[in-house]
Amino acid sequence: MSKIISIATGVPGYKHSQSDLFSYADEVYNKNEQDSRKLGFLYRQSGIEYRHSVMADFSIPEEERTFFSTTAIEESEPDIGKRMEIFNEFAAPLSVETIEKCIDGKINKQEITHLITVSCTGMSAPGLDLQVMEMMDLPRTIVRTSVNFMGCYAAIHAIKIADAFCNSSPDANIIVVCTEFCTLHFQKEFSVDNLTSSLLFADGCAALLMQGDKAGKGLRLENFYSDVLFKGKKDMSWEISNNGFLMTLSGYIPELIKADFEKLVSSALQKTGRKKEDVTNWCIHPGGKKILQSIAESLQLQKEDFLCSYEVLNDFGNMSSPTILFVLQKIMNELEENKVKEAVIFGAAFGPGLTMETFTATYD
């Protein structure tokens, strides 16, 4: 077994209100007054108040924009190369800043033995892992792993890899860092998929420190469980194009997850000899308000059971892979502040496939 010792989060410098983001999207997608009203309704009902971006363009006048310099559909969009230039310039500094917060007071950076980087919004070689190593002056012999292009559930997959490292190297100090710049891939072409992406996705970073089971107080990981709903493989996808990464996100996803989620939870908890009633805290990836509502209905739970997920959605939007770690950080902070002695946490995130990835953990 292994433990999550600490989690830190970070966001890029530009904080945009959902109302400003609606105004920007309305410039791009508005065909007529009726379309504008529909778009405004969707933004208001999103459950999101703020989102962060690596770019200022979404809430400044058009003449001041530097990347998405015009909303005119006839003008060409930034190509994939320009988008990756932004990622390569800003992803590593944000990752390093977040890692340093994560290990502060826990370990010295020279004690880091493993580094796992996670992203589905930017890739290159040398990549984020080597950029972080160089900026932090980490040992060149460090064990590196990159989890790329897996989407919103990738953080759990990375934690699963880190858990395996801890089991084989009990004295390991493992850093997992998830860094996503989803707003880099804004698309001007009007489609349901582009519209949905424009109202949900944001930028963010999260880092965690994992150690072996002999470590001090932390979150002990008990079990991982995953399932794939191939019937939903066309409903959620993430593909590379000349003009950035393209998201497919259908309205059927909440119902697909709802239909199978109770069974998923039962199967996952059965591996640890637990039942749904044993879970004290639910760490659910806030992929969208409807997804959280559908899961609550499937498990016969209330909105109050997912408050940390709703708060992250409200304050940050869906940042893809780091999002569930924002939720988990909130849960861990609340447990510590309330001096809770024991807790059982069930976590779940979803992504292309349609993949459902889960973990079960205890806090003691």
Language-model segments: residues:
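Condensing-enzyme catalytic core mediating Claisen C-C bond formation in acyl metabolism
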Residues: 1-86, 173, 182, 186-255, ...
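Short coil/turn connectors at secondary-structure junctions
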Residues: 1-2, 109-113, 140-143, 168-174, ...
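Conserved beta-ketoacyl condensing-enzyme motif
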Residues: 42, 46-137, 276-292
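Short, well-ordered amphipathic alpha-helical segments that serve as non-catalytic structural scaffolds
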Residues: 44, 48, 90-104, 205, ...
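A short glycine/serine-rich beta->alpha loop
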Residues: 81-87, 117, 144-148, 193-196, ...
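Claisen-condensing/thiolase-fold acyl-transfer catalytic domains that form or cleave C-C bonds
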Residues: 96, 120-121, 139-141, 146-167, ...
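Structural motif
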Residues: 116, 175-177, 208-210, 283, ...
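Active-site-adjacent elements of ketosynthase-type condensing enzymes
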Residues: 124-130, 176-196, 225-242, 289-297, ...
